[in-house]
């Protein structure tokens, strides 16, 4: 821990309180708990959690932390799945200050909505809502947006998404603070917007919304992953289409994983797809879906909007354990989900202190709540579930609808399986069911925590030319599992594989065996959730982290790297 004395820390905390106000500073462990604990796992100590109310306040808080030689952990929604948003244990050599950016939630629309300027606390949901009247969409829709995830959090972690044509979250235009080799805090404006010269001028102009059209330059730098469409169509390439550590997608704020303090990002938006149609495809032979994917990517003039895979087992788990999530979104809309997600987090944190309540009380209560309602899935989906093991939800738009329908009719004259053209309600519910699958495995583990050891959640990216995408585990691994749950973004070959592990199994040892199998298959991992504190960062990613943070003062330890100042290794 830090060598600073208690008196020094008291003076430091007083300085933070002076900068942001006493009501926006937490230092009592009971009050900071929900910011120190990860979404799925991971936690550690922190000296304080501070909530700046403007970009200029954020700059001043950062300066105070650097002067006091504190570790800085930038945190927005704390929805990361691999522990990258929180402290990891208590073996750091300096005190940790968590800077929560939730109050910094402004959003600036540029031009006619073709681009936006997102701030540290801007959520995907608020961005989606602001763009809808303009007929535009952000990089990602229903998914992370439902749990209040931040736009900049996605950029910093190369987050993926279900939309085939948009690739991972990426930009080359951002405003960020970096601690340089001399330990000095510097502000770098690569937004392509004229904001002034000094940090105070730059940040005040953003805080006061004084950006004019004439300030905005278009200098050829990219504000989304511009060539992803060409990469995903290259079905003969022996590398994945996208994954977190892809060196071609690491650029300043993009992929920095908290090694920079990002103040704003400039992003492209996308024209909302009109006349969408969902085709629900089922088969018992994985090679049928392989042929469909390869043909569509190589030959279709119109790429799908989305192509989501579900195995029958995750279909069943999601039907039972994702039912309340499905019903809440279906009946109340996505705009209520961040509120309920936040409420659940606060309730869990409060009930943890009360011995009377069993662990996962809210999960158990919500599970029983879901049982009160009748079956929620359309009859044709249930029929396809009974007939077929493998399901593909193919969403097309515009001219792609006719193109897909005519080809699928011809293809299934000879191929095993079938498809049906969804009604609007069926299509909406099919994709909502797929979304509910993402949290269903976590709910299963919570409800059955007395009976299962844990959930082992992997997200992997397969090589684009791989034809053996469906996993077959050796008996010695299979015997340690209760359930194997496979779902993912099929056109991108990005899969989420959740394993419910039997009671008494060494989950860490099992994970190492799993990762070894993935390495043998040429897969990359993680694909979307980033390394956090659960995966070792490849050498190229470690090099990127060192370049961004030479003193190792920002989110140290990420990717299983050193937690010590100046990247010193433990002797």
Please give the residue ranges for each predicted region.
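A charged N-terminal "starter" segment
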Residues: 1-27
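FAD-binding subdomain of flavoenzyme oxidoreductases
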Residues: 132-288
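Structural signature of FAD isoalloxazine-binding scaffolds in flavoprotein oxidoreductases
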Residues: 51, 81-105, 161-184, 259
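Anion-binding (especially nucleotide phosphate/pyrophosphate-binding) glycine-rich loop
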Residues: 89-98, 103-104, 109-151
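Conserved glycine-rich FAD pyrophosphate-binding loop
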Residues: 4-5, 39-41, 45-47, 70, ...
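Glycine-rich N-terminal segment of FAD-binding domains in flavoprotein oxidoreductases
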Residues: 30-32, 36-104, 118, 138-139
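General beta-strand structural signal in soluble alpha/beta enzymes
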Residues: 25-29, 51-52, 72-76, 83, ...
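A conserved active-site cap/scaffold subdomain adjacent to cofactor or substrate pockets
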Residues: 274-306, 313, 320-368, 378-411
């Amino acid at each position: 821990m830090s060598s600073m004395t208690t008196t020094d820390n008291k003076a430091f905390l007083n300085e933070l309180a002076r900068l942001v106000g006493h009501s926006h500073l937490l230092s009592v462990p009971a009050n900071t708990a929900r910011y120190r604990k990860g979404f799925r796992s991971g936690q550690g100590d922190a000296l304080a959690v501070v909530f700046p109310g403007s970009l200029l306040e954020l700059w001043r808080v950062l300066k105070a932390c650097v002067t006091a030689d504190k570790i800085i952990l930038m945190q927005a929604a704390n929805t990361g799945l691999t522990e990258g948003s929180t402290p990891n244990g208590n073996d750091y050599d300096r005190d940790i200050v968590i800077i929560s950016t939730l109050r910094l939630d402004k959003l600036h629309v540029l031009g006619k909505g073709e681009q936006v300027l997102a701030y540290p606390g801007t959520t995907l949901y608020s961005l989606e809502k602001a763009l809808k009247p303009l007929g535009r969409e952000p990089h990602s829709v229903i998914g992370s947006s439902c749990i209040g995830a931040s736009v900049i959090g996605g950029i910093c972690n190369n987050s993926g998404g279900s939309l085939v044509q948009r690739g991972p979250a990426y930009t080359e235009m951002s405003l960020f603070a970096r601690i340089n080799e001399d330990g000095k805090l510097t502000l770098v404006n690569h937004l392509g917007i004229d904001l002034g010269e000094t940090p105070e001028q730059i940040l005040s102009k953003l805080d006061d919304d004084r950006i004019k059209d004439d300030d905005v330059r278009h200098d050829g730098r990219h504000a989304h992953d511009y060539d992803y469409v060409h990469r995903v169509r290259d079905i003969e390439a022996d590398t994945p289409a996208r994954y977190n550590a892809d060196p071609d997608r690491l650029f300043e704020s993009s992929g920095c994983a908290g090694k920079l303090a990002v103040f704003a990002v400039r992003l492209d938006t996308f024209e909302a797809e009109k006349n969408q149609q969902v085709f629900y495809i089922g088969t018992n032979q994985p090679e049928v879906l392989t042929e469909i994917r390869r043909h569509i990517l190589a030959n279709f003039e119109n790429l799908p909007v989305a192509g989501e895979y579900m195995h029958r087992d995750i279909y069943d788990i999601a039907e039972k354990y994702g039912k309340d999530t499905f019903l809440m979104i279906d009946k109340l809309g996505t705009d209520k989900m961040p509120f309920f997600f936040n409420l659940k987090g606060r309730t869990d944190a409060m009930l943890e202190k009360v011995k009377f309540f069993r662990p996962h009380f809210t999960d158990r209560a919500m599970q029983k709540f879901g049982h009160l309602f009748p079956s929620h899935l359309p009859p044709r989906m249930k029929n396809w579930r009974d007939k077929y093991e493998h399901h593909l939800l193919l969403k097309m738009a515009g001219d792609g609808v006719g193109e897909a329908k005519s080809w699928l009719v011809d293809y299934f004259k000879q191929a095993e399986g079938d498809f049906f053209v969804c009604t609007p309600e069926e299509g909406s519910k099919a994709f909502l069911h797929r979304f509910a699958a993402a949290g269903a495995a976590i709910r299963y583990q919570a409800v059955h925590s007395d009976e299962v050891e844990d959930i082992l959640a992997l997200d992997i990216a397969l090589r684009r030319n791989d034809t053996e995408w469906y996993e077959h585990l050796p008996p010695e691994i299979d015997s340690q599992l209760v359930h194997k749950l496979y779902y993912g973004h099929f056109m991108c070959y990005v899969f989420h594989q959740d394993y419910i592990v039997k009671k008494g199994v060494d989950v860490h040892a099992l994970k190492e065996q799993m990762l070894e199998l993935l390495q043998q298959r040429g897969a990359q991992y993680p694909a979307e959730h980033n390394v956090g504190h659960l995966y070792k960062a490849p050498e190229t990613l470690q090099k990127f982290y060192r370049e961004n943070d030479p003193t190792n003062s920002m989110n140290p330890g990420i990717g299983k790297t050193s937690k010590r100042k100046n990247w010193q290794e433990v002797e």
